[in-house]
């Protein structure tokens, strides 16, 4: 068996076209969607992510505001900026790029963002709404995965799904979204015993653990849908510098029915969902203003 590859770039391009049309319609009515991005420190990976988000905004017709702070900035300065952005009606989405330097309380920073502008979906109220299957801004990576599964027509109701990883950013919300869709979900992590037992019976496997090529083909049920959320850079050997996921693509693609590549799989959809959340926020703002 050779798995069919889920092309995240193609799906993202299609969805971004729809988002751009919605953004243009809003702008024509006097409300241009706007995303504010705050970057603290000089983490190279964070800087790359922020540049990608800003560039994606520009292409979609979404205005972006970028605020950069030094590594040693007083957290009070950032909190003051968040308060100002919360109060600015022209700003519809606010994103603080993680991770933050050690002097910050990340949870407090995320809670300081207005729920109505929390386009990353990390505020406790949005997480709570997700857990109750209520309308909420959804975390972008799990939301992107759900869009991919929907686009591929993967049956979720009654499916056995395994999520490997329990982070607040991916693992936990991913499990909640799959549960809300009717799947029977098992969350596995570093203390899970006999991981192969769980993955071997799963119709859907979502790998989000940050370990290069950890999930191999012999761990999978034939025909399974495999979603690789990981992105790792190989640091040594002949493949040094190359990006790979948490799934060993070569072996897994011989067993799976559907599989996402790295790069070009989940990554493009993550930023796409950020754009969609920003436009949704702007649409709500326009409706409230009678535009």
Swiss-Prot record:
NCBIfam families (UniProt xref): PRK10792.1 (NF008058), PRK14186.1 (NF010783), PRK14189.1 (NF010786)
Organism annotation: Azoarcus sp. (strain BH72)
Protein name from the UniProt record: Bifunctional protein FolD
Disulphide bridges, residue numbers: none
Highest taxon of the lineage: Bacteria
Subunit structure: Homodimer.
One Gene Ontology cellular component: cytosol
Enzyme Commission designation: 1.5.1.5, 3.5.4.9
InterPro entries: Aminoacid_DH-like_N_sf, NAD(P)-bd_dom_sf, THF_DH/CycHdrlase, THF_DH/CycHdrlase_cat_dom, THF_DH/CycHdrlase_CS, THF_DH/CycHdrlase_NAD-bd_dom
Binding site for NADP(+): 165-167, 190, 231
């Amino acid at each position: 068996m050779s798995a069919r590859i889920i092309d995240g770039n193609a799906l993202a391009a299609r969805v971004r076209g729809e988002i751009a049309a919605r953004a243009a319609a809003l702008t024509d009515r006097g409300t241009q969607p706007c995303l504010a991005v705050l970057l603290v420190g000089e983490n190279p990976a964070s800087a790359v992510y922020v540049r990608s988000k800003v560039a994606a905004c520009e292409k979609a017709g979404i205005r972006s505001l970028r605020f950069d702070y030094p590594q040693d900035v007083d957290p009070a300065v950032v909190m003051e900026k968040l308060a100002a952005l919360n109060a600015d009606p022209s700003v519809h989405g606010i994103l603080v790029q993680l991770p933050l330097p050690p002097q910050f309380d990340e949870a407090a920073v995320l809670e300081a963002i207005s729920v109505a502008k929390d386009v990353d979906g990390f505020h406790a109220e949005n997480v709570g709404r997700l857990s109750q299957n209520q309308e909420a801004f959804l975390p972008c990576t799990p939301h992107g995965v759900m869009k991919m599964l929907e686009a591929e027509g993967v049956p979720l109701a009654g499916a056995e799904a395994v999520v490997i990883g329990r982070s607040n950013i991916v693992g936990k919300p991913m499990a909640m979204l799959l549960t809300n869709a009717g799947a029977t979900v098992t969350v596995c992590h570093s203390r899970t015993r006999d991981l192969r037992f769980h993955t071997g019976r799963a119709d859907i496997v979502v790998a989000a653990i940050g370990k290069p090529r950890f999930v191999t083909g012999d761990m999978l049920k034939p025909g399974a849908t495999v979603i690789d959320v990981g992105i790792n850079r190989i640091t040594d050997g002949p493949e040094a510098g190359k990006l790979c996921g948490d799934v060993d693509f070569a072996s897994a693609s011989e067993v799976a029915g559907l599989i996402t590549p790295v790069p070009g799989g989940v990554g493009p959809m993550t930023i796409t969902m950020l754009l969609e959340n920003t436009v949704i926020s702007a649409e709500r703002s326009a409706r409230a203003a009678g535009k």
